[in-house]
């Protein structure tokens, strides 16, 4: 299957949404609403998703769309775009530049293309499950095989205790060489780019995960849920740089 036309649209979506969102970042008085799930949302989130939806509908009107802010349409289509206009809205509204835009393309329910776009940092990562590039340059995961030599990342250090086995996570964290909360999509970019080794999120939505799967796999890494099961659909994510490290992490997280 030739993904070239979809890859072109994906990069166009990333650039267009980034240009829309950037002026809102760091703006004084930015209005923040709280959604029913207690997560924040802004005009930038909503406007960027509307923009991307419009571009997709114009280019591929038969494709489906699933977005964080406006839900799904034609989600049973052969091709479905999955959109998270601002992954890391809490970072966005507090002036932390590690937020990004996640864009994925599903083919018959599985992610085949993914993009992480960091507009403030000027980084665009694209993966197709076989290859992965950062600003057009091929990247690969590191070769770390043990937890003791690993840099471990997570978005919120308190979430494992809320949603998974907190004691197991804390024990794993104590074993790691370095632990940081460079989280949300930026953490997965660091794993795929070869700067970190493990990225964990104990609670995820489809728009959080879909783009990450072809990116991590394209960079040579392994991505599953917290029990080593299917990466998508899933409600949690473990991404590791090598199969050996992934096996060790999954074993450590076991209840």
Which role fits each region the language model picked out?
Residues 140-255:
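An extended, acidic
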Residues 27-28, 99, 126-131, 217, ...:
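A short, compositionally biased
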Residues 21, 45, 56, 89, ...:
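Residue-level signal for inorganic ion chemistry
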